[in-house]
A protein has these predicted regions:
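Helix-to-loop junction immediately C-terminal to a conserved catalytic motif
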Residues: 50
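ABC ATPase nucleotide-binding domains
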Residues: 81-84, 88, 92-235
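Non-catalytic connector elements of ABC transporters
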Residues: 243-248, 254-371
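The feature captures the beta-strand-to-loop junction immediately N-terminal to the Walker
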Residues: 35-37
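ABC ATPase nucleotide-binding domain
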Residues: 5, 25, 61, 343-345
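ABC ATPase nucleotide-binding domain helices that frame the ATP-binding cleft
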Residues: 43-46, 148
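Conserved ABC transporter NBD signature motif
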Residues: 58-70
Length: 371
């Protein structure tokens, strides 16, 4: 399976820039998710890698082989890139059985009949759809059709599998099941998967790395937990996480290589960073995940219950303090009366400090309030 390298890839239509100077290294056998909201450039990026869209400039390589180069005037057609596609629309032939749908691409590639039969049987078993071999697409559920589409795409043994929002047509339960299947399939197949979604849950649970984009610009390219715990900037911090990260404006004054005095919620506190850091401005924003706002009678801060959103296993509690509405997540079903007093703390060493002007991450650490 190839290592895919994009170097300074740009796609422009007139004055509109869809993807701007993107450099990306997709490692062999990785599962990379292109994540972002509609119009961010993620699907355009996938289509350029696959050969369905021609970049305006830049270079794309599969291992050492150039697939596209604006300087060298090279553009290898999609059909010769040995890739597979799985889209939101399964595009199964309605007049063909499951077996015939899976075999169709192999027949087009002039595989021998014996090899086709063996490969179809292998894919039916891999995708756990052997019992549906002689059924037609109309006789299958959405999840079953999805499995057939995956089997058909993987049958020719593509070097890379491209998936564009493949689970968006499924209900929530089926999406969860298919996430499990896709992750297992990636491990078993040993292929390189490139996956497009706007759903952060899919990106977090499936990926070896997330490529988060906004307005055609790469914001962060890192493993899911790094994106979650150390977002590169305020956009990433706000985009990833449900409930969303609390972003609170504050003022800070550095007093030692890894410590700053801060004013937050009308209180004085100290930010103790895990490492030395540099500050260019006193204007900062603190990023606090909801799980780092534990509710306790012995909490350092007092606020009011703004709303309570129980969801069974956990409850999101909205807390009003000063001019801020904060989200806290607590385990179990808890209900607070509106405007009831709540004591809580800012806990853990995963509190993030951002430069409010540039939006870039400065440091992570802990916040200690003065008594």
């Amino acid at each position: 399976m190839p290592r895919i390298t994009l170097t300074n890839v740009t796609k422009q239509w007139g004055k509109f820039i869809g993807v701007n100077d993107l450099t990306l290294d997709i490692e062999d056998k990785s599962f990379v998710t292109l994540l972002g909201s509609s119009g961010c450039g993620k699907t355009t990026t996938l289509r350029m890698i696959a050969g369905l869209e021609t970049p305006t400039k830049g270079e794309i390589r599969f291992d050492d082989k150039i697939m596209f180069s604006s300087e060298k005037n090279i553009n290898v057609p999609a059909a010769k890139r040995e890739v597979g596609f799985l889209f939101q629309n399964y595009a199964l032939w309605p007049h063909m059985t499951v077996t015939q749908n899976i075999a169709f691409g192999l027949e087009t590639l002039k595989w021998k009949k014996a090899d086709i039969s063996a490969r179809v049987a292998e894919m039916l078993k891999t995708m756990k759809i052997e019992q549906f071999a002689q059924r037609y697409p109309a006789e299958l559920s959405g999840g079953q059709q999805q499995r057939v589409a995956i089997a058909r795409t993987l049958a020719p043994k593509p070097r890379v599998l491209f998936m564009d929002e493949p689970l968006s047509n499924l209900d929530a339960k089926l999406r969860g099941e298919m996430r499990t299947e896709l992750k297992r399939l990636h491990k078993d197949m040993g292929s390189t998967f490139v996956y497009v979604t706007h759903d952060q849950l899919e990106a977090m649970t499936l990926s070896t790395k997330i490529c988060l984009m906004n307005e055609g610009v790469l914001q962060q390219y890192a493993p899911p937990l790094e994106v979650y715990n150390r977002p590169a900037n305020l956009f990433v911090a706000d985009f990833v996480g449900n409930p969303a990260m609390n972003i609170v404006e504050a003022k800070a004054k550095k007093i030692s290589p890894n410590v700053a005095d801060i004013e937050i919620f009308g209180h004085h506190a100290v930010f103790q960073a895990n490492d030395d850091f540099d500050m260019k401005s006193e204007k900062i924003s603190l990023g606090i995940r909801p799980e780092f706002l534990p509710i306790s009678d012995r909490g350092d801060l007092e606020g009011q219950a703004y709303s309570t959103l129980p969801a069974g296993m956990e409850t999101t509690v909205k807390i009003k303090i000063a001019d801020e509405i904060l989200s806290s997540v607590v385990f179990g079903a808890i209900d607070y009366e509106t405007d009831a007093k709540i004591r809580f703390s800012v806990a853990g060493n995963g509190i993030l400090m951002f430069d409010r002007v540039s939006g870039l991450l400065i440091a992570n650490g802990r916040v200690v309030f003065e008594n």
